[in-house]
Amino acid sequence: MAVESRVTQEEIKKEPEKPIDREKTCPLLLRVFTTNNGRHHRMDEFSRGNVPSSELQIYTWMDATLKELTSLVKEVYPEARKKGTHFNFAIVFMDLKRPGYRVKEIGSTMSGRKGTDDSMTLQSQKFQIGDYLDIAITPPNRAPPSSGRMRPY
C-alpha cells in the first residue's frame, strides 16, 4: 500500500510545481537535525526509533526553500549567522527495500552569499511528509568536507 502511494506522489511531482497558498494550506511538521562539525549524522543514529538529540521542529510548507530553512535555523543558532557559514542539506528517509534509513544530499547554502541551491524547495527534491532533514553546519573558519557523498551509507 505504501509503495503504491509513493508511486502516485512521484507521478504528481512530474508536473510543474504549483504555488502553495500558505493562508489556506496547513503547514507540515519538519523534523530537522543539525550538526556543527560539517558532517551529517550517521544513519545508525536514526535506527530503532531513535533520533539524534539536536532536533529542531519547524512548521513549514512543501514549497519552503533551502534559503528560507537556513534563515529559520540561524534564528535558533546565533553562531550560524556568521558570514561564510556553510549549510549542507540532506533528506533522511525510511528505506522501503530494506530495514533502516537512507540519506540523499539535496543542496547547500551559505550565510551572506547567494547560491544556486537557495531557491531549491523540499517539494522539488521529492521530500515526503515523515522524512527528516539533516543539516551539516560548517563554521566559516573551517572548510566543509570535500564531499559527503563519498561516505558509505
Curated annotation (Swiss-Prot):
It comes from Mus musculus. Expressed in all tissues tested; highest levels in the brain, kidney and muscle; lowest levels in lung spleen, liver, intestine and testis, and moderate levels in salivary gland and heart. InterPro entries: Hist_deAcase_cplx_SAP18, SAP18, SAP18_sf. The lineage of its organism: Eukaryota, Metazoa, Chordata, Craniata, Vertebrata. Keywords: Acetylation, Cytoplasm, Isopeptide bond, mRNA processing, mRNA splicing, Nucleus, Repressor, Transcription, Transcription regulation, Ubl conjugation. Residues 93-153 are annotated as: Involved in splicing regulation activity. It is found in: Nucleus; Cytoplasm; Nucleus speckle. Belongs to the SAP18 family. This is Histone deacetylase complex subunit SAP18. The modification N-acetylalanine is found at residue 2. One of its GO terms (molecular function) is transcription corepressor activity. One of its GO terms (cellular component) is nucleoplasm.
